[in-house]
Amino acid sequence: MPVLLVVSLAPAAQADAPYERVLNGTFDTTKAPWWSSGNTPSRVDAGRLCADVPAGTVNPWDSMLGENDIPLEAGRPYTLRFTATATADVTIRAGLGLAVAPSTTMFSKSAAVTSTPKTFTFTGTSSLSTLRGQVNFQFGGAAKAYTFCVDDVSLTGGAIPPGGGKDYGSPVRVNQVGYATTGPKEASIVDDSTTPVPWELRDSAGKVVKKGRTQVRGDDAASGDHVHIADFGDYRKEGTGYTLAVGTAVSEPFGISRDPYDGLRRDSLEYFYLVRSGTPIDAAYVGDAYARPAGHLGVAPNKGDTSVPCLPGTCDYSLDVSGGWYDAGDQGKYVVNGALAAWQLMDSYERSLSTGDWANLKDGLLKVPEAGNRVPDVLDESRWEVEFLLKMQVPAGQPLTGMAHHKIHDLAWTALPTQPQADAQPRYLHAPSTAATLNLAAAAAQCARVWQPYDRAFAAKCLAAAKTAWQAALAHPAVYAPAEDSVGGGAYADTDVADEFSWAATELYATTGDRTYLKSMTGRITADGFSWRDTGALTDLTIARLPWRFPLDRVLGARQRVLGVADQYVRNIDSQGYPNPFKAAAYPWGSSSSTTNNALVIATAYDLTHRPGYRDAVLESMDYLLGRNGLNQSFVTGYGERASTNEHGRIWAHQLDPKLPTPPPGSLAGGPNSALQDPVAQQNLPGCAPAKCYIDDIFSYSTNETAVNWNSSLAWIAAFAAGK
């Protein structure tokens, strides 16, 4: 759920050793990221964290208060200090351990707590190195209920300072997948020299096949690196195992080939089959490791999704909302995010149709059940989501008829890992919103257009739903999803829907030609880009994609704006040490999708002009995603020697359970997020340069999640790159 909002906390101390390891040990305003057992409710009271301890438990760990994700180093001593009181004279246990199986205890000490505040100090040694440490207070076994309060919690120790100890590998950064024979080929080198330095291109046998000297790009603000560029674009011999060397530093290996992205084109799209809800994921298509039973089809222990009620007080009916895609790290399904993802897949289809990139339109391109049905696989996959979106529409005869429910998800967060078929949480429809309704209208109108040649009945159903949603949005133009509705799923709050009105009107006009929609087409593309919350740019992108469907003045204006924004994105690439079309002082949640979405705009500019510079800029954007960045990190699972493998999610949790697989090849990680919006990021990345605020850890949901609208953008770009 890429929109989960979390209080950003800094460690209690960032000075000299001993290093502070606890986040928020003073509880001045909030208890996050501290937690308590379900039977032990806790709250902040007068700057203390207080927990109501129940009676009648047996084991010490039956009632607990704690903080997870504490980094520990094997063989290092740690000192735990805290001040505590209780409403009864009790003896608790305080200690340090492992937050995940096998729940190893580093030390556990008894503390006699009374109503008089007392400060305790305990010391012990960690037996292992981990990012999964846990400070805990255990209360189980109490004969009578009481309240325990704690303040000024501190854990100090370890030799590695917070934010330190990072290994970025070689300073020579390349696209770890490879380069197209006729495309640009550059490497970024971290080197303090202010004058050019020599480089060598070596083949798989170590033979030097090309030499040159770097160009000094200089200080790169986003990464904090001083960067040189090595350009070997005129070397075109195909092969694998190439490396680029600068002195004794050698890059990760890479290839040179005519189509380095053909595999990624497939894998990034097949991701969507793997996140389908309401259907078995068949080993015949994905292999045994990724196969699983259907989730959320009303089979116990599931409590959804064939008859899902509304949250109490919001409606009195239930809907069958089975199907669709699981959104991100959770197993919720969200109209605003899902509609954008479906739009990008359908837009990739329309783009390939208009440019003659026939390989992207194959039936049988993907390993999916629909292969062989004489429909392009990319449309089959988008249909799986669109059919779910249609189910989210409020039925006739009900209040807010024609609007779309904002989302459906669990009542509370499920644990990691949780397989969809094992989810026992109640699931609820959340109230309709204008944003969701317009997203449905846009995606359904596009669906009607692209499905007309293949399934006229389905196309007609989509168009009817789109028109109904449009009228419902006009009747209810300011119904907003609450930002605080973020328990059990992301909020996806949006209180400015002028851009959604514009997008929906554009798609409806493109499909129907009805001029009444023109006056609502006010959205414009800007260098700020687009996202699930900001869809105004999609007006210009759709007009530019389908110029024959729009008035000439609209086409000329959209074309001019798309080219202007694309030029800015190209300048972003050229002005940075690493080729990212996204440039900002701070990196947001899901920054990888800012890269892919901006690259989509550049690719559209190429389609409009066929200028090679735009194509090259898209390919260089792929360089950034696949390792040519400040982290020397490929953000795409399965692609590159240093690829992300531990993305946040409940299904593919190999980091927590070795019996489970890693995320599938072609999964895009969220990428650097300089706001550090989860405890793992806060513990391990304080002081990071914006472009380096990333950690490949399953619990870092703010830097390392996957999401359907991020992978749809990657799939769009991969399809473009595979054709170039």
Segments (PLM) and residue ranges:
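Short Trp-Ser/Thr-centered turn/loop motifs at beta-strand boundaries
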Residues: 67, 108-110, 246-254
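Aromatic (Trp/Tyr) and acidic
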Residues: 176-248, 258-260, 270-343, 347-348, ...
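Extracellular and organelle-lumenal recognition/adhesion modules and their flexible linkers in secreted
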Residues: 16-164
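Short beta-strand edge segments in extracellular beta-sheet folds
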Residues: 155-156, 255-261
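Structural beta-strand segments of beta-rich domains
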Residues: 78-80, 170, 183-187
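Carboxylate/His-rich catalytic cores and anion/metal-binding grooves
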Residues: 376-400
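Short, compositionally biased P/S/T/A/G/V-rich stretches that sit at domain boundaries
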Residues: 166-177
